[in-house]
Amino acid sequence: MNNSKVRINSFELLNIKNVNYGKITVNSKRIANNSDILGIYGQNGSGKTTVVDAFKILKDMMEGNQLPQETVNYISANEDTMKLCFDFSINDNKNFDVVYEFSIANNNNFPVIIEEKLTYKESSLSGHSKKTITYSSVSEDNWLTPKIIARQLGVDKTTDLIVAKKISEKEHKSFFFNEEVAMCFKDNLEDVTDILCTLHNFACTDLFVIQSSDSNITWLN
């Protein structure tokens, strides 16, 4: 998927800063020939900066970066966790509809990624159901579901995933976008590997986020 086109169709924010729940739909078309131009406007306190902050968190997650400690400050007051959900279209030899969502909690003033979920479907196959892979850092027995994944990967790769899980938790990084996870998935979960690699490349090369703390003017491209 070296020449893939990635589009963000919509995103949902829960319990982030002053936004208890918000959803923005960027474009109703799943496939577009031209780039979207998105303008966010509204009165002070309406959540414009929160949207930019949410994209910064997304970028850090998909690039496999360590979440900054101040990420915990984005969790809404009196809430334990925040949740971000992004709906993508990936267009290439295979076209996929993808939803990537994750939840972050505050543990002693450090961000803890308690869950990541990847739901995908090949958009050209209308009769096929969606597939979902869920990672949980707070579950000992069902930390990666469906459990058939472990049987597909075998003992050695499952052990490598457990090591990757511990590293991701210690370093406050995404599990799905850990390089070791991609290596474990690539032979048995080809579509998942392609999707994760495509989203990673999109975050690194096409998703630019400048927060208000970096500039007097906030831009989101």
Go through the PLM ranges and name each one.
Residues 21, 94-99, 128-132:
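Short, mixed charged/polar active-site loops
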Residues 13-15, 86-94, 118-122:
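Short acidic, glycine-rich loop/turn motifs
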Residues 4-6, 17-19, 93-97, 108-113:
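Coil-to-beta-strand transition motifs
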Residues 1-60:
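Pre-Walker A-like glycine/lysine-rich segment at the N-terminus of P-loop NTPase domains
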Residues 52-109:
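Conserved P-loop NTP-binding catalytic core
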Residues 105-221:
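Electropositive, glycine-dotted interaction segments
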